[in-house]
Amino acid sequence: MNQLDQLKRLTTVVADTGNFLQLAQFAPQDATTNPSLILKAVQQAEYAPLLTETVARHRGLPLDQVVDQVLVRFGLEILKIVPGRVSTEVDARLSFDTAATVARAHRIINLYDDAGIGRERVLIKIASTWEGIQAAAELEREGIHCNLTLLFAFAQAVACGAAGVQLISPFVGRIYDWYKKSAGANWDEAAMAGANDPGVKSVAQIYSYYKKFGIATEVMGASFRNVGQITALAGCDLLTISPDLLAQLQASEEPISAALDAAAARDAAIDAVRYDEPGFRFALNEDAMATEKLAEGIRAFAADAAKLDKMILAL
């Protein structure tokens, strides 16, 4: 049995791509998108007609509404292939505006509803800022489920769990990138692999905390750099994986066993933590990696959103 099929026995496998034509070969349960992945997809020849057609159909609407139409169109195509959920992201430029994030989420979910897609098949993706987490809490109370992304710090995970969000996406690879760059010539790749990888350790800590205290929020490891990071998190609730790494898993017959164990986590010696807004902001500020990576991630998604805007305006 290949590694992908083995992994599916332990974890819900999610495809991290806007390239929906690649999905069927991997048979994932869910799929995730973000502004960068959608931008990458629309720059490929096979998706150009979809972009052109969607923009033409909604010409005359304000730009931000046309963008949401494009994002949802990709989501609808993905949902024709995956049996589960798709994550569609709110504009990263709204990451510090709770009310605007809620309003944009309403618009996205209404577009899916107009297309006959139930709320249970859509996750609204929001950056894990304090403002984003408050928006998600409000949306969850309305029955609109959220995926809190750009999550790098334990404090972000604790706040998301307390807010009752459906799912979080802790970023394994970007955490790994930061520590590797910080260590420079002193980085020992072999010693820092697998369970010792700082990104893997972050997800494992969050997973254990949630299971210990019965927090229902799903943990979906994201942003992987290599197969070793994925197999080191086998047993996590979900893992969202790029097509390149899905293909590598599919090509390997190496055995995989569960690395995370909910029952063991429930017996772990962990103390409960709570954060109000000042405490959250201070904890995040104390974590240089998380502070830098959250800011960098928002900037990158905002820049790609602006590039997509320009592409649409040029049509």
From Swiss-Prot:
Top enzyme category: transferase
Record's GO cellular component terms: cytoplasm
GO molecular function: transaldolase activity
Positions annotated as active site in the UniProt record: K125 (schiff-base intermediate with substrate)
Subcellular location: Cytoplasm
Pfam families: TAL_FSA (PF00923)
Gene3D superfamilies: Aldolase class I
InterPro entries in the record: Aldolase_TIM, TAL/FSA, Transaldolase_1, Transaldolase_AS
Assembly with partners or alone: Homodimer.
Protein known as: Transaldolase
Gene assigned in the entry: tal
